[in-house]
Amino acid sequence: GVAIADNPEGPYEIQPEPIKGINGIDPCVLKASDGNHYIFWGNGRCAKLADNMLELAEDNPKTVMKWRDRELEMVGVNCLEGLPSRQAEGPFAFEYNGNYYLTYPYVRENTEVIGYAMAKNPMGPYEYKGIIMAEHENGCWTNHHSIVNYKGQWYFFYHRNDYSPNFDKSRSARIEKLYFNEDGTIQEIKPTERGVGPVKASHKVQIDRYSTIDGAAIEYL
Protein backbone atom coordinates (compact mmCIF):
# COMPACT_ATOMS: atom_id res chain seq x y z
CA GLY A 1 0.00 0.00 0.00
CA VAL A 2 0.95 3.66 -0.41
CA ALA A 3 0.18 6.73 1.69
CA ILE A 4 1.00 10.29 0.55
CA ALA A 5 1.74 13.47 2.50
CA ASP A 6 3.21 16.90 1.79
CA ASN A 7 5.50 16.64 4.83
CA PRO A 8 7.41 13.72 6.39
CA GLU A 9 5.46 14.10 9.63
CA GLY A 10 2.11 13.87 7.79
CA PRO A 11 -0.81 13.81 7.79
CA TYR A 12 -0.82 10.94 5.30
CA GLU A 13 -3.61 10.05 2.90
CA ILE A 14 -3.91 6.32 2.21
CA GLN A 15 -4.26 5.53 -1.49
CA PRO A 16 -7.18 3.28 -2.48
CA GLU A 17 -5.06 0.72 -4.37
CA PRO A 18 -1.76 -1.04 -3.58
CA ILE A 19 1.07 -1.15 -6.09
CA LYS A 20 0.12 -3.88 -8.55
CA GLY A 21 2.75 -6.51 -9.33
CA ILE A 22 4.27 -6.73 -5.86
CA ASN A 23 3.60 -9.94 -3.97
CA GLY A 24 5.52 -9.73 -0.73
CA ILE A 25 6.28 -7.90 2.49
CA ASP A 26 8.96 -5.58 3.94
CA PRO A 27 9.21 -2.95 1.16
CA CYS A 28 12.18 -0.61 0.86
CA VAL A 29 12.40 2.28 -1.64
CA LEU A 30 15.75 3.48 -2.96
CA LYS A 31 16.23 6.82 -4.73
CA ALA A 32 19.20 6.11 -6.97
CA SER A 33 21.67 8.56 -8.48
CA ASP A 34 20.31 7.70 -11.94
CA GLY A 35 17.18 9.67 -10.98
CA ASN A 36 14.89 6.65 -10.66
CA HIS A 37 13.24 5.09 -7.63
CA TYR A 38 13.48 1.34 -7.04
CA ILE A 39 11.43 -0.77 -4.68
CA PHE A 40 12.78 -3.90 -2.98
CA TRP A 41 10.63 -6.39 -1.08
CA GLY A 42 10.79 -9.74 0.71
CA ASN A 43 12.60 -12.67 -0.93
CA GLY A 44 14.94 -10.29 -2.71
CA ARG A 45 12.86 -8.96 -5.57
CA CYS A 46 13.38 -5.50 -7.02
CA ALA A 47 11.57 -3.38 -9.60
CA LYS A 48 11.75 0.18 -10.88
CA LEU A 49 8.91 2.47 -9.85
CA ALA A 50 7.06 4.73 -12.26
CA ASP A 51 7.53 8.48 -11.86
CA ASN A 52 4.30 8.75 -9.83
CA MET A 53 5.63 6.10 -7.39
CA LEU A 54 2.14 4.55 -7.33
CA GLU A 55 2.86 1.82 -9.86
CA LEU A 56 5.74 -0.11 -11.37
CA ALA A 57 7.49 1.23 -14.46
CA GLU A 58 6.47 -0.26 -17.79
CA ASP A 59 10.03 -1.19 -18.76
CA ASN A 60 10.54 -3.64 -15.89
CA PRO A 61 11.52 -7.18 -16.94
CA LYS A 62 8.82 -9.81 -16.50
CA THR A 63 9.08 -13.54 -15.91
CA VAL A 64 6.51 -16.30 -15.47
CA MET A 65 6.74 -18.56 -12.42
CA LYS A 66 4.75 -21.72 -11.82
CA TRP A 67 3.15 -21.89 -8.38
CA ARG A 68 1.02 -24.94 -7.57
CA ASP A 69 -1.38 -25.20 -10.50
CA ARG A 70 -1.05 -21.59 -11.63
CA GLU A 71 1.33 -19.45 -13.62
CA LEU A 72 2.21 -16.11 -12.02
CA GLU A 73 3.75 -13.16 -13.83
CA MET A 74 6.62 -11.80 -11.76
CA VAL A 75 7.66 -8.18 -12.33
CA GLY A 76 11.24 -7.02 -11.79
CA VAL A 77 14.25 -9.16 -10.97
CA ASN A 78 15.35 -11.55 -8.24
CA CYS A 79 18.36 -9.78 -6.69
CA LEU A 80 19.15 -12.77 -4.47
CA GLU A 81 19.68 -15.17 -7.36
CA GLY A 82 23.01 -16.88 -6.81
CA LEU A 83 23.40 -15.44 -3.30
CA PRO A 84 23.13 -17.36 -0.01
CA SER A 85 19.63 -16.82 1.31
CA ARG A 86 17.65 -19.98 2.20
CA GLN A 87 15.02 -17.73 3.73
CA ALA A 88 15.26 -13.97 3.19
CA GLU A 89 13.13 -11.01 4.19
CA GLY A 90 13.41 -7.35 5.20
CA PRO A 91 15.74 -6.09 2.44
CA PHE A 92 17.31 -2.65 2.76
CA ALA A 93 19.09 -1.07 -0.21
CA PHE A 94 21.28 2.03 -0.32
CA GLU A 95 23.96 3.68 -2.44
CA TYR A 96 27.45 4.75 -1.38
CA ASN A 97 30.49 5.90 -3.31
CA GLY A 98 29.37 4.51 -6.66
CA ASN A 99 28.20 1.16 -5.29
CA TYR A 100 24.72 -0.18 -4.60
CA TYR A 101 24.26 -2.30 -1.49
CA LEU A 102 21.54 -4.88 -0.92
CA THR A 103 21.40 -5.87 2.75
CA TYR A 104 19.02 -8.49 4.06
CA PRO A 105 18.37 -10.91 6.93
CA TYR A 106 18.72 -14.55 5.97
CA VAL A 107 19.04 -17.90 7.73
CA ARG A 108 22.67 -18.99 7.58
CA GLU A 109 22.39 -21.89 10.02
CA ASN A 110 19.70 -21.76 12.70
CA THR A 111 18.58 -18.14 12.92
CA GLU A 112 18.99 -14.98 10.90
CA VAL A 113 22.12 -12.99 10.17
CA ILE A 114 22.39 -9.71 8.24
CA GLY A 115 24.20 -10.32 4.97
CA TYR A 116 24.95 -7.96 2.12
CA ALA A 117 25.82 -7.87 -1.55
CA MET A 118 27.15 -5.14 -3.85
CA ALA A 119 26.43 -4.11 -7.44
CA LYS A 120 27.06 -1.29 -9.90
CA ASN A 121 23.39 -1.21 -10.92
CA PRO A 122 20.37 -0.86 -8.58
CA MET A 123 18.80 -4.02 -10.03
CA GLY A 124 22.02 -6.01 -10.00
CA PRO A 125 23.54 -8.41 -10.60
CA TYR A 126 24.65 -8.38 -6.95
CA GLU A 127 27.78 -10.06 -5.64
CA TYR A 128 27.61 -11.46 -2.12
CA LYS A 129 30.22 -9.93 0.20
CA GLY A 130 29.56 -11.34 3.65
CA ILE A 131 27.97 -10.64 7.02
CA ILE A 132 27.21 -7.30 8.65
CA MET A 133 25.83 -8.82 11.85
CA ALA A 134 25.98 -12.47 12.94
CA GLU A 135 23.40 -14.54 14.82
CA HIS A 136 22.30 -13.39 18.26
CA GLU A 137 23.68 -15.64 20.99
CA ASN A 138 20.17 -16.37 22.33
CA GLY A 139 18.89 -17.39 18.90
CA CYS A 140 16.33 -14.60 18.41
CA TRP A 141 14.95 -13.69 14.99
CA THR A 142 14.81 -9.97 15.56
CA ASN A 143 17.37 -8.22 13.43
CA HIS A 144 15.48 -6.35 10.71
CA HIS A 145 17.45 -3.21 10.02
CA SER A 146 17.93 0.14 8.30
CA ILE A 147 21.14 1.98 7.35
CA VAL A 148 21.34 5.79 7.42
CA ASN A 149 23.99 8.43 6.79
CA TYR A 150 23.65 11.32 9.24
CA LYS A 151 26.10 14.22 9.14
CA GLY A 152 28.76 12.09 7.47
CA GLN A 153 28.48 9.12 9.83
CA TRP A 154 26.74 5.89 8.82
CA TYR A 155 24.46 4.23 11.37
CA PHE A 156 22.99 0.74 11.54
CA PHE A 157 19.54 0.47 13.14
CA TYR A 158 18.21 -2.94 14.16
CA HIS A 159 16.18 -4.63 16.87
CA ARG A 160 16.70 -7.51 19.29
CA ASN A 161 14.92 -9.23 22.15
CA ASP A 162 17.54 -9.08 24.90
CA TYR A 163 14.98 -7.82 27.38
CA SER A 164 12.56 -10.67 26.61
CA PRO A 165 14.73 -13.66 25.61
CA ASN A 166 11.86 -16.11 26.04
CA PHE A 167 9.45 -14.15 23.83
CA ASP A 168 10.82 -12.85 20.54
CA LYS A 169 7.97 -10.41 19.86
CA SER A 170 8.99 -7.95 22.59
CA ARG A 171 11.77 -6.23 20.71
CA SER A 172 13.99 -3.28 21.58
CA ALA A 173 15.42 -0.81 19.05
CA ARG A 174 19.22 -0.68 18.77
CA ILE A 175 21.75 1.47 16.90
CA GLU A 176 25.45 1.02 16.13
CA LYS A 177 27.93 2.93 13.98
CA LEU A 178 28.71 1.38 10.60
CA TYR A 179 32.08 1.62 8.83
CA PHE A 180 33.32 0.83 5.32
CA ASN A 181 36.66 -0.58 4.25
CA GLU A 182 38.69 1.16 1.53
CA ASP A 183 37.35 -1.25 -1.11
CA GLY A 184 33.74 -0.40 -0.20
CA THR A 185 33.01 -3.56 1.76
CA ILE A 186 31.33 -3.21 5.16
CA GLN A 187 33.02 -4.00 8.45
CA GLU A 188 31.16 -6.56 10.56
CA ILE A 189 29.27 -5.00 13.47
CA LYS A 190 29.45 -6.44 16.96
CA PRO A 191 26.27 -5.61 18.90
CA THR A 192 26.88 -3.60 22.05
CA GLU A 193 24.82 -2.57 25.05
CA ARG A 194 26.14 0.96 24.71
CA GLY A 195 24.93 2.00 21.27
CA VAL A 196 26.19 5.37 20.02
CA GLY A 197 25.23 7.81 22.78
CA PRO A 198 27.63 9.66 25.08
CA VAL A 199 28.98 7.78 28.10
CA LYS A 200 29.27 9.33 31.56
CA ALA A 201 32.75 9.25 33.04
CA SER A 202 31.44 7.47 36.12
CA HIS A 203 29.95 4.58 34.10
CA LYS A 204 31.62 1.37 33.00
CA VAL A 205 32.94 1.59 29.44
CA GLN A 206 32.56 -1.31 27.01
CA ILE A 207 35.96 -1.36 25.29
CA ASP A 208 35.40 -3.78 22.39
CA ARG A 209 35.05 -0.91 19.93
CA TYR A 210 38.38 0.58 20.99
CA SER A 211 40.40 -2.60 20.45
CA THR A 212 41.82 -3.73 17.10
CA ILE A 213 42.67 -7.20 18.41
CA ASP A 214 40.89 -9.72 16.19
CA GLY A 215 38.51 -11.88 18.19
CA ALA A 216 38.89 -9.83 21.37
CA ALA A 217 36.23 -10.50 23.98
CA ILE A 218 34.00 -7.74 25.34
CA GLU A 219 35.50 -6.39 28.53
CA TYR A 220 34.70 -3.49 30.84
CA LEU A 221 36.86 -0.93 32.62
At which residue positions do the language-model features occur?
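Carbohydrate-active catalytic/glycan-binding domains of CAZyme proteins
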Residues: 1-221
